[in-house]
Amino acid sequence: MYGIEYTTILTILISIILLNYILKTITNTMDYIIFRFLLLIALISPFVRTQNYGMYLPITGSLDAVYTNSTSGEPFLTSTLCLYYPAEAKNEISDDEWENTLSQLFLTKGWPIGSVYFKDYNDINTFSVNPQLYCDYNVVLMRYDNTSELDASELADLILNEWLCNPMDISLYYYQQSSESNKWISMGTDCTVKVCPLNTQTLGIGCKTTDVNTFEIVASSEKLVITDVVNGVNHNINISINTCTIRNCNKLGPRENVAIIQVGGPNALDITADPTTVPQVQRIMRINWKKWWQVFYTVVDYINQVIQVMSKRSRSLDAAAFYYRI
């Protein structure tokens, strides 16, 4: 009898000891795994670079802070600012430290060192198609060219607004524009655009559908054309397909974190499509053309006034001028 009781007690003690050993083993194993995992993270973290809105930029977020060197007495909202300029500016200045100089000057206006980025572009036409506007605020310097005033206003329309575009097969189909935000955008080295409006029987109105020479010419030998026709009317379209492409586009809305500073020219560009409205010049400003150093000094002086007519960061993160839908 006593032997059975002792055996039971011994079995219980052995079970407790074994359970304690198993729990300690599991705990040590988990500690080992967690330690190795944390060690691995610590070792690889210096080599891992995450993307901020599609580009390696140190986005600082939104932090209210007062900067003693700021000329503004109000707390400045820390943000990122991208300044886009023609490559000719850098070539004329010819100073390896010019960006650092400008950064120091922007600091006096409340922009901390490292919050302003400078990016050059070679061709405004190419830039407008895919501008890559990633900062909280984006300011584009566009040199005025009196030989392409119409192109410049249309380029500004592309940069300041977001567009959703579809390819068009004008050899098989006719098209119509459904609203004022619906436009046909043509690009190429030489774009001549002709249209023939159609009636409900698909017969030409004032033109013959079988003879492109009777079509109305809406653009001739241009690099960029934003075609606006009568809404709700079908049109046959003819373009120089070897040197030009055309897309059916809808304007989604303004990029309110983008502004254009026109350098030179008698008047600021007007990109308003509706002739009954006040010209849309709030985010298009003009400064007199001088040497590029003088242009940048003027930009620094007025940058905070420019920012006041903008909104921080557009709804689009990778803000390309076109969104293609295939």
UniProtKB/Swiss-Prot annotation:
Q: Where is the signal peptide?
A: 1-50
Protein's cellular compartments: Virion; Host endoplasmic reticulum lumen
GO molecular function list? metal ion binding
Q: Which residues carry a glycan?
A: 69, 146, 238
Modification after translation is described as: Intramolecular disulfide bonds.
Segments of this protein annotated with the region GPR motif: 253-255
- Main location per the UniProt record: virion
> Which is one Pfam family of this protein?
VP7
Which key words tag this protein in UniProt?
Answer: Calcium, Capsid protein, Disulfide bond, Glycoprotein, Host endoplasmic reticulum, Host-virus interaction, Metal-binding, Outer capsid protein, Signal, T=13 icosahedral capsid protein, Virion
Q: Name one GO cellular component term.
A: host cell endoplasmic reticulum lumen
Got any disulfides in this one, which pairs? 82-135, 165-249, 191-244, 196-207
List positions binding Ca(2+) 1. Answer: 95, 206, 214, 216
- Give me the residues that bind Ca(2+) 2, please: 177, 228-229, 301
Q: Which InterPro entries match?
A: VP7 (IPR001963), VP7_1 (IPR042207), VP7_2 (IPR042210)
User: Record's HAMAP family?
Assistant: Rota_VP7, Rota_VP7_A
Q: What does this protein do?
A: Calcium-binding protein that interacts with rotavirus cell receptors once the initial attachment by VP4 has been achieved. Rotavirus attachment and entry into the host cell probably involves multiple sequential contacts between the outer capsid proteins VP4 and VP7, and the cell receptors. Following entry into the host cell, low intracellular or intravesicular Ca(2+) concentration probably causes the calcium-stabilized VP7 trimers to dissociate from the virion. This step is probably necessary for the membrane-disrupting entry step and the release of VP4, which is locked onto the virion by VP7.
What family does the entry list?
Belongs to the rotavirus VP7 family.
Q: What is this protein called?
A: Outer capsid glycoprotein VP7
Task: Name the source organism.
Answer: Rotavirus A (isolate RVA/Human/Australia/Hu5/1977/G2P[X])
